[in-house]
Amino acid sequence: MLKFREWSKEFFGRKLTIQYGKVAKQSSGAAWVQFGDSVVLATANISDRVIEGVDFVPLTVEYQEKFYAAGKIPGGFIKREGKPTESAILSARLIDRPIRPLFPKYLRNDVQLIVTVLSVDGDTPPDVTGIFAASLALNFSKIPFQGIVAGVRIGYVDGEFVIFPTEEQLKNSKLDIVVAGSKDAITMVEGEAKEVTEEEMVQALMVAHEAIKKLIEFEEEILREFNVEKMEIEEPKPKDELIGRFEELLVENELRKRLLIKEKLERSLKLKEYKEELISKIFEEFEIDDEEKLTQEMLLKELFDEKAKKLMRKIIINEGIRADGRTPEEIRPITCEVGVLPRTHGSALFTRGETQSLGIVTLGAPMEEQIVDTIMEEGTKRFILHYNFPPFSVGEVKPLRGPGRREIGHGHLAERALKAVAPDEEDFPYVVRVVSEILESNGSSSMATVCSGSLALMDAGVPIKTHVAGVAMGLIVDEENEVVLTDIQGLEDHWGDMDFKVAGTRNGITAFQMDCKIAGVGEELLKKALKQARVARMRILDIMFETIKEPRKSLSPYAPLIANIEIDPMKVGELIGPGGKVIKSIVKEFDVEISIDDVTGKVSVYGKDQNKVNQAIEYIKTLTREIEVGDMFEGKITRIEPYGLFVELMPGKIGLAHSSKLGNDSKEFRKKYKVGDVIKVVVVNIDDSGRIQLGKAEE
């Protein structure tokens, strides 16, 4: 093991420093990485115990956001970090996705990668640095990790691509994507865009890959100093005699018949029955003790799945036929409905084959904005999308708990896709919440969410610029051929080589996500996949526009009503009143809710009755208006003194009508008026101290 080492290099205007052997020395692998003023610590460890009975790599990636990294104390009653925030979960997924395919297929030991954010500057988000740190930590460790990866964030500002754009540059960028990959190819993409073209997207990915190569060269330079002995993983196989008998019993034509059943559940059932039939026959012929039988059974099941996978891929490549009978470029049948729920503010049902999303839109008042408080961001969020994937959508039985990482990730992608067409606050002051309930799933449910969400937004009368549609693309590759699949279903996602999701409008791409199970994809394949995805997106958009072509002109009668008014920020105190007295009285009298921006003076009034909302607005206008000489009021007498009447013109505004200004009533005013009477007065003077002098207005 090497002692403490440090490496530094300039990249993209920032200094990148890696330290090894100083901290977390008991971890199998640890990398301290500083990029700019952002610092992350990645640690990688593996259990010595093999987990029995699992058919996947048990990898866990944790991303810890420490508030001290940004010089902040966590909000709330308990002043310490709790469960991972949504942003931390998304960052963990961002790191997980490019590294997961690089573990041996048969690794069955628990692997835990923890990326801890220790310091952060606003211009160098630590999530992408975490990909670089994770790759180093895994390569420093004894864990059998088979590759070197790195990632970059790329923007598109004023016609120029920018690697690791600053926070200010991202505000004006048409593009915000994270790209990860190896030296040879791109393996992961995640991000959003403002209707960029396919050509611009490919160009961005190629620029990003050139930057990734530079980072990987630095990694290679570091790792050349290491000669770590890696843990050996033995590839488990069924016994030779069992494999031989399995090959004899398996009839390819029988397997083919079952693979080409169009309906997902029936296909799954028939494949399961055939698998169990074969394995049962084998165990009838061979004596195997109970302890070994469980392992051999699992290995035979894996062997069957591998045979089915190879046959499905062979049929697609050689015959151009997919499991449900479609051609590679064919989309599943689509139906769209809007207004399916009578009491919601907007709703839509989008069905594509055996994938179905129910989209629901709820409109809320400005005070219902989501508060955002992370180490990278503070503020509020007006456009929110939540994605729910209940177990019944795939015919399973599972406990209902909170959203998992997958649900959070899918919802975030769909939100980014739709956010590009969402109206500005000035045009539509509502908080908008979109919920996607996945009622049925056979692949591409996140893209179905984009479609149902777009339809529901128009149904709700939200003035989105245009429809957004999404489609998931797949890839099947062998030594000589590559076939891009349009609108993949679950089986093709599971057994294919790529999951490539593209969402956008007729004008361009608004969200993009790609994950590869192979070494990666090159420029020509990206061009082909994006071109094919655009053709599919146009078809889907045509169907959506046939269903509802523009946002409804009026909101649902059950939606809240909002009216805005801007007042002088100096008048905010008067509107609130001492102890909130004035604003509370308005809320109670007109049955509304009010939010005030004390910096801009913007006042939002929210209620269910249009008349009451309008009345409240008029009342606020009157209350906060500048009083000028000549203005007339019907005011209430609050006090009577020998020298005149004190009259409340509006809450908090009182003037004095001197006895000499009361006309014919100047001598007998104390007998004629009493406290609480309403009198019509006119403003005759306002002195330098702001005191208002009144006179009796002529009847």
Swiss-Prot record:
Residues 630-697 form the S1 motif domain. One of its GO terms (cellular component) is cytosol. Mg(2+) binds at D493, D499. It is found in: Cytoplasm. SUPFAM superfamilies: Eukaryotic type KH-domain (KH-domain type I) (SSF54791), Nucleic acid-binding proteins (SSF50249), Ribonuclease PH domain 2-like (SSF55666), Ribosomal protein S5 domain 2-like (SSF54211). Residues 560-620 form the KH domain. Keywords: Cytoplasm, Magnesium, Metal-binding, Nucleotidyltransferase, RNA-binding, Transferase. Gene3D superfamilies: GHMP Kinase, N-terminal domain, K Homology domain, type 1, Nucleic acid-binding proteins. Coiled coil: none annotated. It catalyses: RNA(n+1) + phosphate = RNA(n) + a ribonucleoside 5'-diphosphate. Its EC number is 2.7.7.8. GO terms for molecular function: 3'-5'-RNA exonuclease activity; magnesium ion binding; polyribonucleotide nucleotidyltransferase activity; RNA binding. InterPro entries: ExoRNase_PH_dom1, ExoRNase_PH_dom2, ExoRNase_PH_dom2_sf, KH_dom, KH_dom_type_1, KH_dom_type_1_sf, NA-bd_OB-fold, PNPase. Its cofactor is Mg(2+). GO terms for biological process: mRNA catabolic process; RNA processing. Belongs to the polyribonucleotide nucleotidyltransferase family. PANTHER family: POLYRIBONUCLEOTIDE NUCLEOTIDYLTRANSFERASE (PTHR11252), POLYRIBONUCLEOTIDE NUCLEOTIDYLTRANSFERASE 1, MITOCHONDRIAL (PTHR11252:SF0). Involved in mRNA degradation. Catalyzes the phosphorolysis of single-stranded polyribonucleotides processively in the 3'- to 5'-direction. This is Polyribonucleotide nucleotidyltransferase. It comes from Thermosipho melanesiensis (strain DSM 12029 / CIP 104789 / BI429). The lineage of its organism: Bacteria, Thermotogati, Thermotogota, Thermotogae, Thermotogales.
